[in-house]
Amino acid sequence: MECIFCKIVAGQIPAKKVKEDEHMLAFHDIDPKAPTHILLIPKRHLASLAEAGSRDHALLGHLLVKAAEVAREQGLDRGYRVVISTGPDGGQTVDHLHVHVMGGRPMHWPPG
């Protein structure tokens, strides 16, 4: 197993977890880009959004619902940003789908 996020799911690498269920794990990003920066990952390896198919509909919806729950639990009442980076040009740096929840400061547009 070479995927760092799969190793986190397996408990081989520690993470500061904030939420977990049978389908996903949420934890603090080790290189935060906002005062609150949480990653949500599916427990099943899925390389990116580009590789998602019809069998992933429920999982993707679940991740978004859990992202909103995490934002509420983290006190992001004034707003937050949800990001899924896909592929090298999209800024994806880990080949395991992950949802960023960022907040705690004004999030400007365009992002960069």
Residue ranges and their predicted role:
Residues M1-G112:
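HIT superfamily nucleotide-processing domains
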